[in-house]
């Protein structure tokens, strides 16, 4: 019974994060499932399975308030499909050669490396925004890429209000899909990438990522279940039940807060999960 309640509350919290910052809560859910004994590969696969219906609802809500760029979502989702398949292949190799302990170590070490890095950039950008009294700014890296990286074709993203090279957008999508399949995280890399590489506003980046997550989740779930049988549908249903409520609460919340708060919330949660995984590892 304790595990049931834990999974429901975990899903609720993950759903709120998904609707609020566009991440899908992937950096919270797999560690939570692993904390109650789920092997790393099953935690990754089950998270991906629950992701796409939740992401579909969140994307629809964000579309209604104009926070989803269809062109970014379409291009990145196409590349993400290939990234997902590559990620599943790598994860399957780790599982075959090192077993459940190897997948647990792989997932944990990836969290400990990537999460603090992304958190640093988010916090730095928030400090710069507040220092200059601006709610949300186009990051310096994105401005430089927009001016100097002009490898055609150049694509204009109307909702995001930026123009970037197709050859910058596609690798960003591939990397998002790869991480989503290997360590269950895509959104916490996808959202910062859309912000810091493509230059989209925070609310558009988080809303667009939900559309990408829907495509990644639906295609990735099929591959995980069909080829590796790694999806635990009981855990998936429990987490999804909580997430479907949480994602709507989180999506509504974005209309009432300043954009820099999305980055700050993302950074704080990432650091908390990093500390939790580090203590678990130790």
Predicted regions and their residues:
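Juxtamembrane transmembrane-helix boundary motif
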Residues: 1-10, 64-175, 226-282
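Transmembrane alpha-helix interface/packing and boundary motifs in multi-pass membrane proteins
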Residues: 10-22, 173-184
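Juxtamembrane transmembrane-helix termini in multi-pass membrane transport proteins
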Residues: 21, 26-73
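Transmembrane helix boundary and interhelical junction motifs in multipass membrane proteins
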Residues: 21-29, 182-193
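A helix-boundary/kink motif common to multi-pass secondary transporters
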Residues: 22, 39, 69, 95, ...
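Interfacial segments of multi-pass membrane proteins
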Residues: 29-42, 190-204, 223
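Structural signature of hydrophobic alpha-helical transmembrane segments
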Residues: 39-52, 210, 229-243
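Membrane-interface helix-cap regions at the ends of transmembrane helices
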Residues: 54-65, 215-231
């Amino acid at each position: 019974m304790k595990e049931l309640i834990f999974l429901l509350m975990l899903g609720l919290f993950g759903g709120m994060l998904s609707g609020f910052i566009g991440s899908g809560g992937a950096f919270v859910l797999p560690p939570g499932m692993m904390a109650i004994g789920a092997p790393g590969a099953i935690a990754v696969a089950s998270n991906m399975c629950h992701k796409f219906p939740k992401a579909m609802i969140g994307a629809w809500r964000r579309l209604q308030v104009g926070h989803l760029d269809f062109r970014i979502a379409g291009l990145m989702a196409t590349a993400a499909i290939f990234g997902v398949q590559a990620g599943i292949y790598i994860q399957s190799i780790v599982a075959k050669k090192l077993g459940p302990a190897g997948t647990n170590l792989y997932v944990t070490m990836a969290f400990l490396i990537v999460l603090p890095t992304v958190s640093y950039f988010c916090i730095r950008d928030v400090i710069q925004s507040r220092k200059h009294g601006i709610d949300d700014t186009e990051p310096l890296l994105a401005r430089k890429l927009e001016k100097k990286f002009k490898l055609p074709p150049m694509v204009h993203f109307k909702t995001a209000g930026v123009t970037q090279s197709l050859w910058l957008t596609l690798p960003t999508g591939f990397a998002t899909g790869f991480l989503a399949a290997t360590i269950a995280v895509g959104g916490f890399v996808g959202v910062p990438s859309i912000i810091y590489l493509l230059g989209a506003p925070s609310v558009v980046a988080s809303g667009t990522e939900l559309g990408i997550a829907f495509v990644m989740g639906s295609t990735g779930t099929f591959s995980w279940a069909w080829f590796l049988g790694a999806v635990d549908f009981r855990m998936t249903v429990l987490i999804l039940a909580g997430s479907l409520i949480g994602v709507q609460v989180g999506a509504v919340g974005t209309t009432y807060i300043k954009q820099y708060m999305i980055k700050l919330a993302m950074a704080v949660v990432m650091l908390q999960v990093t500390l939790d995984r580090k203590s678990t590892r130790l």
